[in-house]
Regions:
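Intrinsically disordered, low-complexity segments enriched in proline/serine/threonine
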Residues: 19-20, 29, 67, 102-105, ...
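Intrinsic disorder/low-complexity segments enriched in polar/charged and small flexible residues
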Residues: 7, 23-25, 42-44, 85, ...
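Intrinsically disordered, low-complexity segments enriched in Ser/Pro/Gly/Ala and basic residues
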Residues: 1, 8-11, 30, 35, ...
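Terminal beta-strand-rich extracellular "head" domains
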Residues: 47-109
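C-terminal interaction-tip segments
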Residues: 2-16, 37, 112-128
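Beta-rich globular "head" domains
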Residues: 21-64, 119-124
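Solvent-exposed, conformationally flexible loop/turn segments
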Residues: 10-22, 37, 81-87, 101
């Protein structure tokens, strides 16, 4: 069983300001729920247009995004030095024990001098 939500490349872009944790916006908002309880592998794939001067891009899955119950999990920092002006597909994955009442989202942070842009983006939950 798996669920996939995606924004096609070229349909809608999202600017991510530097040095500010920002929730990635997928087609129905910033959070998604699974159909049944269990262990789910969450995967996100982002098409990132890099600006100048960055050295790190951080990504983390979060349970209960946008609420006081926020609980981060599955973090991964990527070295983006030398990627100025380039466009890359990047992905993150993490296994989360969750049920239909628990929303999950993904947020990112970067240290570039100006916003980076997300073009195509998708989030998938696959039951293990």
């Amino acid at each position: 069983v798996s669920n996939l939500w995606k924004v096609e490349s070229g349909k809608s872009k999202q600017a991510i300001p530097p040095k500010a944790w920002t929730w990635v916006e997928y087609p129905k908002g910033i959070s998604y729920k699974v159909d049944s309880a269990g262990e789910w592998e969450w995967i996100t794939i982002l098409l990132v247009e890099f600006s100048a001067g960055g050295s790190v891009l951080r990504g983390r899955f979060g349970r209960y995004p946008g609420t006081e119950k926020l609980d981060e999990t599955g973090h991964d920092d990527k070295n983006i030095g030398g990627w100025d002006g380039k466009v890359y597909h990047l992905h993150w994955a993490h296994t989360i024990k969750c049920d239909p009442s628990m929303p999950v989202g993904f947020w990112i942070w970067h240290d570039s001098k100006s916003p980076i842009v997300l073009d195509g983006r998708q989030i998938k939950a696959k039951k293990l």
